[in-house]
């Protein structure tokens, strides 16, 4: 994916690699920062349509506009880093209401 197209609150499909294998699965994520460093590391928040969210996770109110196929949850408690090259395709963006909820959750999680 072209770095120019990656900005916070973009929803992308990303490769999630298994720790002890070359295998991966493709999952939607919310870009939570700008690419950083020589390896172009990007903070991402995984998205899931599965029930069982933690209290800090955010139920996306406008999931369809974000390019998602099902009602979904931003798994804020599982924020992680991936390489820019593992972002495969932009599928949408998070609206202002959901952005505010995610920002509040990140502030609580990271004690900012």
Give the location of each predicted region.
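Compact nucleic-acid interaction/catalytic patches
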Residues: 20-26, 31-64
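C-terminal terminal-subdomain/extension
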Residues: 63-112
């Amino acid at each position: 994916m072209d770095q120019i197209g990656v900005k916070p609150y973009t929803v992308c499909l990303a490769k999630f690699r298994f720790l002890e294998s070359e295998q991966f699965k493709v999952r939607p994520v919310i870009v939570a920062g700008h690419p950083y460093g020589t390896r172009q590391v990007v903070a991402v928040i995984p998205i899931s349509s599965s029930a069982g969210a933690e209290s800090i996770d955010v139920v996306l109110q406008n999931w369809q506009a974000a390019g998602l196929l099902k009602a979904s949850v931003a798994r804020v408690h599982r924020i992680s880093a991936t390489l820019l090259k593992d972002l495969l395709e932009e599928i949408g963006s998070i609206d202002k209401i959901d952005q505010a909820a995610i920002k509040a959750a990140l502030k609580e999680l990271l004690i900012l």
